[in-house]
């Protein structure tokens, strides 16, 4: 039974990731006035499966000078963390009902840094190492703003439990009442998942392919799956935090559909941003966080600390 539960939890995520790659190629294609994949299957719908078969049947090569154990463990760790992040998410029911769900998510997103660092170092390539160091600096930096924004949301919510956020947002979504936080959170998630315009780790023009330059076949596919699973997970977390309750009178299946639609909308915005904006320069990326986001998030956090004290408020779910 446990294995069945695990499979029913992992397979839909991997299917969603597979079709996200197809949607991305289609959306980017239409935005650039071309068709995108349309050969394999009707309207190119079987393209992700063809890619998966091709990648997993090829021989996994590795550089002679690489560190074998770390080189193999890095993609496995990346995919494991990307799948584990989903466990506490209420959609509307979660696999693990954690009281400290948000801390769990924050800790796991911090752990993903190690897989990138291992892959860059174990490849024994200067391009991979530079890409990995960029990724680590970027991820750790933007986690600071993510943590402070989460703290502000938790001060409004009154607990670290994700399920209570739907009660908090019964009247108004937090994306309306705390829009500066939501805006900074969304931009920080773009940086956290290494997406354009913050994709400095995979800068093709300067670093060939970044930290995964020496990976091929299966291990490369695992990094690819981890990246896209993280994108969907981050947008699901954004939906829970800022676009919570759907007011459907406990109709679980309708709740799930509305949750899915909101997450899809945010994911499409990720693709739109990728198609629209050029890559940031590295110093601009760091200045955006340390000189703009950090002072703003700290000021807003202090505001949300002082507001309940000044108005003698109690958490919404009590």
Swiss-Prot record:
Q: Where in the cell is it found?
A: Mitochondrion inner membrane
Q: Name one GO cellular component term.
A: mitochondrial inner membrane
Where it mainly occurs, coarsely classed, is mitochondrion
Give coiled-coil spans as residue ranges: none
Alphabetized HAMAP family for the sequence: NDH1_NuoH (MF_01350)
Q: Which protein family is it in?
A: Belongs to the complex I subunit 1 family.
- What name is this protein filed under? NADH-ubiquinone oxidoreductase chain 1
Q: Which reaction does it catalyse?
A: a ubiquinone + NADH + 5 H(+)(in) = a ubiquinol + NAD(+) + 4 H(+)(out)
EC identifiers of the protein: 7.1.1.2
GO BP annotations, alphabetical order? aerobic respiration
The protein's matches in InterPro entries, at most eight in alphabetical order, are given as: NADH_UbQ_OxRdtase_su1/FPO (IPR001694), NADH_UbQ_OxRdtase_su1_CS (IPR018086)
The terms under GO molecular function for this entry are:
NADH dehydrogenase (ubiquinone) activity
Which species is this UniProt entry from? Sminthopsis crassicaudata
Question: What is the membrane topology here?
Answer: Multi-pass membrane protein
| Membrane spanning residue stretches | 3-23, 68-88, 100-120, 136-156, 172-192, 222-242, 253-273, 294-314
Function as written in the Swiss-Prot or TrEMBL entry: Core subunit of the mitochondrial membrane respiratory chain NADH dehydrogenase (Complex I) that is believed to belong to the minimal assembly required for catalysis. Complex I functions in the transfer of electrons from NADH to the respiratory chain. The immediate electron acceptor for the enzyme is believed to be ubiquinone.
Keywords assigned by UniProt, alphabetized: Electron transport, Membrane, Mitochondrion, Mitochondrion inner membrane, NAD, Respiratory chain, Translocase, Transmembrane, Transmembrane helix, Transport, Ubiquinone
Q: What lineage, starting at the top, does this entry show?
A: Eukaryota, Metazoa, Chordata, Craniata, Vertebrata
The EC class name is translocase
Question: So which domain of life are we looking at?
Answer: Eukaryota
Keyword set includes Mitochondrion = yes
């Amino acid at each position: 039974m446990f294995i069945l539960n695990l499979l029913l939890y992992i397979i839909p995520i991997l299917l969603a990731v597979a079709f996200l790659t197809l949607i991305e190629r289609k959306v980017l294609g239409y935005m650039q006035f071309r068709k995108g994949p349309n050969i394999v299957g009707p309207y190119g719908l079987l393209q992700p499966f063809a890619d998966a078969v091709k990648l997993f049947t090829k021989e996994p090569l590795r550089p002679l000078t690489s560190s074998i154990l770390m080189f193999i463990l890095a993609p496995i760790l990346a995919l494991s963390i990307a799948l584990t992040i989903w466990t506490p998410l209420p959609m509307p029911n979660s696999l693990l009902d954690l009281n400290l769900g948000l801390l769990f998510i924050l800790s796991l997103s911090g752990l993903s840094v190690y897989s990138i660092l291992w892959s860059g170092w174990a490849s024994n390539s200067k391009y991979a190492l530079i890409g990995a160091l960029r990724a680590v600096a970027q991820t750790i930096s933007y986690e600071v703003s993510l943590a402070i924004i989460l703290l502000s949301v938790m001060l409004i919510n009154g607990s670290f439990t994700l399920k209570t956020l739907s009660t908090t947002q019964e009247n108004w979504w937090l994306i309306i009442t705390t829009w500066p936080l939501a805006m900074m959170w969304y931009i920080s998630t773009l940086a956290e998942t290494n997406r354009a315009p913050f994709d400095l780790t995979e800068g093709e023009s300067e670093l060939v392919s970044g930290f995964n330059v020496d990976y091929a076949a299966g291990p490369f596919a695992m990094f690819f799956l981890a990246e896209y699973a993280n994108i969907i997970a981050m947008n699901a977390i954004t939906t829970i935090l800022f676009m919570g309750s759907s007011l459907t009178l406990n109709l679980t299946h309708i709740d799930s559909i509305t949750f899915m639609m909101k997450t899809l909308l945010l994911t499409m915005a990720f693709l739109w941003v990728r198609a629209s904006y050029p890559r940031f320069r590295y110093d601009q990326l760091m200045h955006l966080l340390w000189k703009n986001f950090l002072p703003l998030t700290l000021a807003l956090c202090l505001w949300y600390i002082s507001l309940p004290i000044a108005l003698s408020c109690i958490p919404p779910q009590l």
